[in-house]
């Protein structure tokens, strides 16, 4: 008898979820990105016990239609792609249709949602990756996700989670990144019934930086603003008197998405080499808008890495912009 067997659906879902959902902060990221894509102006994140036992994300966005609820928890079902070419024209944060099925595979979920064109909202309960019940309820326009008992069915993964404080700090860091990148949306983060962050939707980048990163950093930043060759770069970079011992205060966004790109980070840091002490790092909050055809975000499960096509000189342009902003 052969040794190779097909995996059952639940096992497949758990394996896939492991690539997307590493910890509570992963769930917050995926749900908040969905809220942003749904045109939300106000997003509230509530967590208990570092998000291990309870995560609640509430928005005032478009809501989810009843027909879409049935598909939302099926793998690779998405409202953001229709064909493979759409991957190279992405202006949304989500696109693979993996987030909700992955979350449902490792937790229990409640959803409250209402669209603008319906009189009643929907209350859905999802357990073991499947919809158990759907009822009509009164609820405001928008969507609320309640996530409970993360990794209840993956005890080994659950054991590797850190302390409540560490996991809560990971969530704070993730919310900071999302809030800095979406300054036209207000964010509120509540940890164990205590409000720890509240931003507004003014669209003022500097005010947002002040609220999230504090007065000392906000007051030590220089503005930059460039537009040309199909690329826009704006944001703030630190003066030569403001630096940190690590890269924790470096924020880079491409088309609204927080990304990690060591090439671009190195371009920025090279301009500071003679200005700040060795083994110290500049602070920056940079927003780059570029034709989505010139980047590929579909290279990592977290969608936090990008590749550029050979048609763009983003590295050279960024270097000049940073140099001009410093001198």
Named regions from a protein language model:
Residues 1-327:
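N-terminal phosphate-binding caps/lids of nucleotide- and nucleic-acid-binding domains
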